[in-house]
């Protein structure tokens, strides 16, 4: 007991303070995850707008909701955000003595938890929305889309003029705080941590053991739930925990994949890439009829390949580029879900009507 007390009294607050490289790395982790997921959703939406267009249109809101579930899960169970926990860090209530510090497995107090969640989730969402608004207003102002009598025109001009200075001030504030942190003049590398009333520290062996012990206890303790309200609350809690755990596992794998891509495209690996990609270009594929009764292309370009008559209401298939009569190709695609010539999978939304000057 005496040795434990001596260790506590001699330990300084800065003993567990992470380096600038650790805190910058964990800051950049979620910053890299967002555009990566956004690109994946964009590719899916472009390939199948009917199924994935919703996720592209509401990506910011869906990402913010999932990010909130993930961060709330980690803040309440590990006293850290996902990226902080990934790098072995935790949040400590500022000003608390080592004797009164909560274990990381107990989570943050409610006040500090909600402040941290707001700065981790809500603030980036608002920042993204402001950036999109500024980009849209610049384009509209450049092409003079706003009418001269618009009441909002003056507000748009003021916003566009002030936004770069606000952004510069914001980034300068963060840069100044990081410089003070490097020089040992501040215990927070980010002003948002100070506003949330917490600071970052390293996880100790006791913290890791306590979190592992809590997981074992949670899986072992399964109390019978009696009331319907408690059943619903327990089910929601398990669902949120399951979603957060799935996101955590997926992001961990995704982070590894991003680091692999970073290594793959690094300058040191360029010679390896060139040796692997320096292969002859394969010849273009020879298109074969996808079945025996596939119609042959007519010799005259104005004839529909399906009805063998002059085309009416020219319609092109976006999947293959061939032109048909609208009624012919509409009925065919609706029945077979494929291009009549190539057999490529095709849906009705891939029909594009052509309006030529002759018509």
From Swiss-Prot:
Entries under Pfam families matching the protein: Pex2_Pex12
Keywords recorded for this protein, A-Z: Membrane, Metal-binding, Peroxisome, Protein transport, Transmembrane, Transmembrane helix, Transport, Ubl conjugation pathway, Zinc, Zinc-finger
Annotated zinc fingers (RING-type), start-end: 304-343
GO terms assigned for molecular function: ubiquitin ligase activator activity; ubiquitin-protein transferase activity; zinc ion binding
Cytoplasmic-side segments: 48-51, 140-144, 278-359
Gene Ontology BP annotations: cellular response to reactive oxygen species; peroxisome organization; protein import into peroxisome matrix; protein import into peroxisome matrix, receptor recycling; protein monoubiquitination; protein polyubiquitination
InterPro entries, per the entry: PEX12, Pex_N, Znf_RING/FYVE/PHD
UniProt GO cellular component terms: peroxisomal importomer complex; peroxisomal membrane; peroxisome
Record-annotated membrane-spanning stretches: 20-47, 52-76, 110-139, 145-183, 250-277
Pathway(s) this gene product operates in, as recorded in its UniProt entry: Protein modification; protein ubiquitination
Topology class, membrane: Multi-pass membrane protein
Subcellular location: Peroxisome membrane
SUPFAM superfamilies: RING/U-box
Peroxisomal matrix-facing ranges: 1-19, 77-109, 184-249
Ligand binding (Zn(2+)): 304, 307, 325, 328
CDD domains per the UniProt record, alphabetical: mRING_PEX12
KW Transmembrane helix (keyword) present: yes
Subunit description: Component of the PEX2-PEX10-PEX12 retrotranslocation channel, composed of PEX2, PEX10 and PEX12. Interacts with PEX19 via its cytoplasmic domain.
Family statement drawn from the similarity comment of this UniProt entry: Belongs to the pex2/pex10/pex12 family.
Domain observations: The three subunits of the retrotranslocation channel (PEX2, PEX10 and PEX12) coassemble in the membrane into a channel with an open 10 Angstrom pore. The RING-type zinc-fingers that catalyze PEX5 receptor ubiquitination are positioned above the pore on the cytosolic side of the complex.
Role played: Component of a retrotranslocation channel required for peroxisome organization by mediating export of the PEX5 receptor from peroxisomes to the cytosol, thereby promoting PEX5 recycling. The retrotranslocation channel is composed of PEX2, PEX10 and PEX12; each subunit contributing transmembrane segments that coassemble into an open channel that specifically allows the passage of PEX5 through the peroxisomal membrane. PEX12 also regulates PEX5 recycling by activating the E3 ubiquitin-protein ligase activity of PEX10.
Name of this chain's protein: Peroxisome assembly protein 12
Species, as recorded: Rattus norvegicus
């Amino acid at each position: 007991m005496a040795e434990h007390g001596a260790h506590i009294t001699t330990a300084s607050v800065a003993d567990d303070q992470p380096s600038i490289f650790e805190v910058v790395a964990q800051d950049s982790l979620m910053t890299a995850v967002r555009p990566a997921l956004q690109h994946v959703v964009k590719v899916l939406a472009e390939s199948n707008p009917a199924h994935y267009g919703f996720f592209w249109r509401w990506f910011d809101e869906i990402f913010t909701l999932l990010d909130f579930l993930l961060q709330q899960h980690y803040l309440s169970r590990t006293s850290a955000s996902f990226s902080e926990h990934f790098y072995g860090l935790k949040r400590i209530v500022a000003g608390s003595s080592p004797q009164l510090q909560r274990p990381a497995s107990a989570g943050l107090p409610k006040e500090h938890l909600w402040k941290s969640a707001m700065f981790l989730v809500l603030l980036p969402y608002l920042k993204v929305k402001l950036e999109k608004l500024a980009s849209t207003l610049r384009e509209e102002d450049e092409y003079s889309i706003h009418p001269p009598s618009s009441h909002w025109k003056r507000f748009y001009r003021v916003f566009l003029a002030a936004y770069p200075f606000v952004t510069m001030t914001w980034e300068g504030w963060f840069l100044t705080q990081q410089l003070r942190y490097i020089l040992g003049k501040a215990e927070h590398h980010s002003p948002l941590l100070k506003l949330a009333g917490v600071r970052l520290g390293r996880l100790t062996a006791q913290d890791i053991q306590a979190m592992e012990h809590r997981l074992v206890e949670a899986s072992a303790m399964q109390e019978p739930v009696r009331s319907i309200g408690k059943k619903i609350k327990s089910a929601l809690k398990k669902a949120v925990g399951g979603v957060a755990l799935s996101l955590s596992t997926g992001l961990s794998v995704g982070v590894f994949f991003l680091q692999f891509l970073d290594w793959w495209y690094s300058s040191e690996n360029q010679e390896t890439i060139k040796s692997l990609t320096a292969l002859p270009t394969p010849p273009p594929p020879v298109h074969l009829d996808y079945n025996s009764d596939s119609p042959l292309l007519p010799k005259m370009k104005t004839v529909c390949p399906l009805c063998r008559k002059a085309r009416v209401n020219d319609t092109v298939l976006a999947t293959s580029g061939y032109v048909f009569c609208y009624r012919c190709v509409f009925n065919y695609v609706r029945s077979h879900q494929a291009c009549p010539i190539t057999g490529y999978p095709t849906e009705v939304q891939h029909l594009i009507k052509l309006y030529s000057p002759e018509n």
